[in-house]
Each structure stands twice: as structure tokens, then as C-alpha cells.
Amino acid sequence: MNPASDGGTSESIFDLDYASWGIRSTLMVAGFVFYLGVFVVCHQLSSSLNATYRSLVAREKVFWDLAATRAVFGVQSTAAGLWALLGDPVLHADKARGQQNWCWFHITTATGFFCFENVAVHLSNLIFRTFDLFLVIHHLFAFLGFLGCLVNLQAGHYLAMTTLLLEMSTPFTCVSWMLLKAGWSESLFWKLNQWLMIHMFHCRMVLTYHMWWVCFWHWDGLVSSLYLPHLTLFLVGLALLTLIINPYWTHKKTQQLLNPVDWNFAQPEAKSRPEGNGQLLRKKRP
């Protein structure tokens, strides 16, 4: 199947020759550079304008900038995923093999983002000697999965777009963590955002069940359009997300609503500075 037309728009950012590897690889690089730019701009603006950011240690600043970058990507992914899930007739006509030019744009730029994300996470882990297993697995599977879609002109776009919709929680996660660091964990706004974020994580779980349903009813189309390693990677990743990662993150975010602490950093810092005023620091942290 050749990359499909997006319904007749003659001059559009989506109206490119996506059968060309040069176009697809260029957009992937553009996605990497764009989100690297978001990361750098966030650092510059936060350093200039935000007192909370200036008070953070280096590792927390990196996490802040990554959270903001993920939030921007989350907005892009949510818009694209919702349209694929609810509105695009071509994708709904063939959920296994249907393609759209606008989907090619999001797949290529998302591949660039996940490449950036993997580089950033691994560099951060190397520099700060940390390791988040679930996050590493999540983004490795995401990058390899979207890279598989990018190189395979036969791959359908519906499941790729609904996978992007799983990023619906990232803007709320970003807001939650930034407000937590700013000491706003008792505010009504933080609690409302936390409720919405938990709801988004539950929606993610429901969405994974829908994706399994699509796989079951369109199995023959998936087998004929995806390479076996790519299909295996997708199914293993979806299983990990459904059975382990989504439930774990939903549990942790619910815990955080009831006990608003920064579980990304509080425990390691407490261990690294156990003497003196370590207990006082733990109490001060939101």
C-alpha cells in the first residue's frame, strides 16, 4: 500500500511525498531537533523567569525540562490520537492497513521525539547515576515501534495513532510535578489537576483494551502488513503497558494525590543525606 492522500488538500504540511525515505527521515530529524529546541527553550525561560526552577538541583532541572518537553509532545499526540480514534473515516474503514498523510507526519515527528527522549533519558541516567526501568522500557518500545512504522510503507496508521493518544496524561503529569516543586500541593488547582491526571491514566488503560480489541478483529490485516519482529515488539509492548506499566503508574499517581510527595526524587535525596537536617528537608519538600 502506498502512502494515502489526505483527502485533496493541495498545499499543506501534510501534502508531502511520504513514499520517499528522504522525506520521512528528514521529518524524523526535524522532530528530534524541534523537541530538543523545546527542551533548551524551557531551560532558558525557566532559568530567567522561575525562582522555583533556579532553586532545583541539576538533576531536577533536567527532569523539569523533560517534563515540559513531554507535555508539548503530549498535546500534539492527544490531538492526533483523538482525531484518529473519533474522526478519520479512512482509518476507521481499515484499522489494520489504512493510511493518511497527516498520520505520516505525526509518525515521523514522533519517531524523532522518542529518539530525543531515549538519548536524554540515557544521558541523564549516565550523568546522575540513576535508572528508571519502567521509563526506559516504555520509551525504548515506543521508539522502536514508531521506527518500524516509519520504515514500513505497508504499516497501517490506526494503532500507531491510538498509541500516541496514550500520551494524553503527560501535560497533566508536567503540571503536577512543577506545582509540587513550587509548594502548591495543597492548592485546589493541584488537586484538580491530579484528579484529571488520574482519570487520564484510567483512560489509558481503557484505550489499551480497545487496542487489543482492534488486534483481535483485524489480526489477518496486521500479520500481512507488519513485519514479524515489529508485530512481536508491538504486542509485547502493549502487554507490558496493559498488565504492568499503566497499573503501576496509575497506582503511584493515586498515592500521590493522597500523599503529595515527589517520589521521583525524595527517597534518593533522603538516602544520600541521612544526617543533620535530612528530616527537615523531607518535611519541606511538597
Curated annotation (Swiss-Prot):
Interacts with CLN5. Interacts with CLN3. GO terms for biological process: adult walking behavior; associative learning; ceramide biosynthetic process; ceramide metabolic process; cholesterol metabolic process; glutamate reuptake; lipid biosynthetic process; lipid homeostasis. It is found in: Endoplasmic reticulum membrane; Endoplasmic reticulum-Golgi intermediate compartment membrane; Endoplasmic reticulum. This is Protein CLN8. A motif (ER-retrieval signal) lies at residues 283-286. Could play a role in cell proliferation during neuronal differentiation and in protection against cell death. It is linked to Ceroid lipofuscinosis, neuronal, 8: A form of neuronal ceroid lipofuscinosis with onset in childhood. Neuronal ceroid lipofuscinoses are progressive neurodegenerative, lysosomal storage diseases characterized by intracellular accumulation of autofluorescent liposomal material, and clinically by seizures, dementia, visual loss, and/or cerebral atrophy. The lipopigment patterns observed most often in neuronal ceroid lipofuscinosis type 8 comprise mixed combinations of granular, curvilinear, and fingerprint profiles. Ceroid lipofuscinosis, neuronal, 8, Northern epilepsy variant: A form of neuronal ceroid lipofuscinosis clinically characterized by epilepsy that presents between 5 and 10 years of age with frequent tonic-clonic seizures followed by progressive intellectual disability. Visual loss is not a prominent feature. Intracellular accumulation of autofluorescent material results in curvilinear and granular profiles on ultrastructural analysis. It comes from Homo sapiens. It is a multi-pass membrane protein. Residues 62-262 form the TLC domain. GO terms for molecular function: ceramide binding. The chain crosses the membrane at residues 21-41, 62-84, 103-123, 131-151, 226-246. InterPro entries: TLC-dom, TLCD. Its main location: endoplasmic reticulum. PANTHER family: CT120 PROTEIN, PROTEIN CLN8. One of its GO terms (cellular component) is endoplasmic reticulum-Golgi intermediate compartment. SMART domains: TLC (SM00724). Keywords: Disease variant, Endoplasmic reticulum, Epilepsy, Intellectual disability, Membrane, Neurodegeneration, Neuronal ceroid lipofuscinosis, Transmembrane, Transmembrane helix. Does not seem to be N-glycosylated. Disulfide bonds: none annotated.
